[in-house]
Amino acid sequence: MSLSREKVLESIAQIVHDETGIDKGSVQLDKAFVDDLDIDSISMMTIVVNAEEKYGIEIPDDKVRELRTVGDAVDFIIAAKA
């Protein structure tokens, strides 16, 4: 099953909203988790765990630090599921 960027973005937006209350429409591919969405490290780890559970993948800690934008996370998930 191939995942579209739009579907993964939609699910990441829902996960971010559930954890932080940020409006799903604000969660866009070019938005940085910390700089644009003001997500702290604890919330980011919860978001990562929820994404791992949803997609059945593991995101190593060193990779989490590389996921600066929502688009980075979407692309990582798509690549991990390919």
Curated annotation (Swiss-Prot):
Its main location: cytoplasm. Pathway: Lipid metabolism; fatty acid biosynthesis. InterPro entries: ACP, ACP-like_sf, PP-bd_ACP. One of its GO terms (cellular component) is cytosol. Residues 3-81 form the Carrier domain. The modification O-(pantetheine 4'-phosphoryl)serine is found at residue 41. It is found in: Cytoplasm. GO terms for molecular function: acyl binding; acyl carrier activity. GO terms for biological process: lipid A biosynthetic process. It holds the Pfam family PP-binding. Keywords: Cytoplasm, Fatty acid biosynthesis, Fatty acid metabolism, Lipid biosynthesis, Lipid metabolism, Phosphopantetheine, Phosphoprotein. 4'-phosphopantetheine is transferred from CoA to a specific serine of apo-ACP by AcpS. This modification is essential for activity because fatty acids are bound in thioester linkage to the sulfhydryl of the prosthetic group. It comes from the Bacteria. NCBIfam families: PRK00982.1-1, PRK00982.1-4. Belongs to the acyl carrier protein (ACP) family. HAMAP family: Acyl_carrier. Carrier of the growing fatty acid chain in fatty acid biosynthesis. This is Acyl carrier protein. The gene is acpP.
